[in-house]
Amino acid sequence: MNEWDVGDASRANSRRPPVVSAALGTAVRVLRALAWCESHALNPKDPMPLKYENLDPATRRHAIAELDGDIASGAFHASDRLRPTAVADYQRLLREAIRYYDDLWLEQHANDLLVDFEPRTTRSGAQTTAKVPEMAARMLAEGDFNRYYMRGVALRAIDEGRQAVEVYRARLSLEPRPESAELEGQRLPAREVLDYLRGQRVEDASTLRLGRPNSGLSIRLV
């Protein structure tokens, strides 16, 4: 199906029964996702996303449920680097990424939603402005996607009667930070991990180190 076929299919939706239109719409989105994956695979210069070992339909459903709950309750944390008028667009892109893609797709599509400059505090304590780092979109996309992915894994583990999840390195690092290296291979209570990533207080020091920016760590089912 080429881009003209997709356009024709979309226009035809309005003339089809609701069930058929919904199925066709889903098929179109899946084809677009496959096309993106194929084009991405042919470009080895792209930065690699984290390796999400349990990023399957079941985990995606649980992760989306977590995101939708945050948005509905007003608990969603929007980065200060997002333009205030772009938060809703970013939430939509994040949901789309969780449903079909990964953090790299989110980075590529959210880059234009960031501010150009941000406030900074100098060593003397003075306030100034500085250009947002080039890696800002990567850090934002990776951090948010991985956080909801981990929440999805933890929620899935609980629903499936599993007691724990395991921390693993989702991105190769030749010189991992000592505090990150200590976490690799540890098994943590799934409920405690979920509570912490939802913003609740927990006591386990290991759990408190999950979700830190640019750590390269994630969790998987055991």
Region locations from a protein language model:
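Basic polycationic patches enriched in arginine
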Residues: 11, 15-16, 29-32
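Domain-core detector
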Residues: 35, 41-210, 222
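Short, solvent-exposed loop/turn segments at the edges of secondary structure
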Residues: 212-214
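Long, His/Glu/Asp-enriched segments that create or flank divalent metal/ion-associated functional microenvironments
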Residues: 217-218
